[in-house]
């Protein structure tokens, strides 16, 4: 799916970074309505995500404001693979779990594992703000961000699937 498009449907930015954003909606459509076309379409989105985002580690441009690599693209890839793992079985399910793990490690690279030493006189420094566990935004918009949505829940689930207890500690 194009990242940006006009009202008439023509592409403004044909980058496929927004593709995983459609997956959860398609999976839920399949669950609610039982229509296998939704599941087939969801799988096609993750086929694209695997080949163009996860495999080359090019988590790029899933939002309208940043035309660069960003954690939002990684979290969208994590979420899309999680949703497909939840509705598949056997080897297919394991494949989506493996993709989810790979995307999760990349997404975690955007989260602070330390407390940034903010200078005195800066608001966050004066407040004694601790940045550990908070996300950074992107290389274009370098600031602390609250964007996590389902990520902690997915990490906890993934930790049990792959026997990685560290993932559960984010929850």
PLM regions and their residue ranges:
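Glycan-recognition and catalytic cores of secretory/periplasmic carbohydrate-active enzymes
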Residues: 1-171
């Amino acid at each position: 799916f194009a990242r940006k498009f006009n009202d008439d449907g023509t592409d403004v930015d044909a980058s496929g970074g927004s593709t995983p954003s459609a997956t959860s909606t398609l999976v839920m459509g399949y669950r609610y309505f039982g229509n296998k076309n939704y599941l087939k379409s969801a799988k096609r989105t993750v086929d694209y995500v695997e080949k163009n985002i996860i495999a080359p580690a090019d988590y790029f441009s899933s939002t309208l404001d940043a035309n660069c690599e960003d954690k939002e693209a990684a979290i969208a890839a994590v979420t899309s693979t999680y949703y497909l793992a939840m509705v598949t079985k056997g080897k297919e399910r394991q494949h989506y779990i493996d993709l989810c793990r790979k995307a999760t490690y990349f997404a975690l690279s955007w989260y602070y594992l330390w407390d940034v030493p903010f200078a005195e006189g800066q608001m966050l420094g004066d407040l004694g703000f601790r940045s550990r566990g908070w996300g950074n935004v992107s290389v274009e918009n370098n600031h602390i961000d609250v964007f996590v949505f389902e990520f902690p829940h997915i990490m906890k689930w993934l930790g049990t699937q792959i026997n990685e207890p560290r993932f559960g500690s984010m929850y």
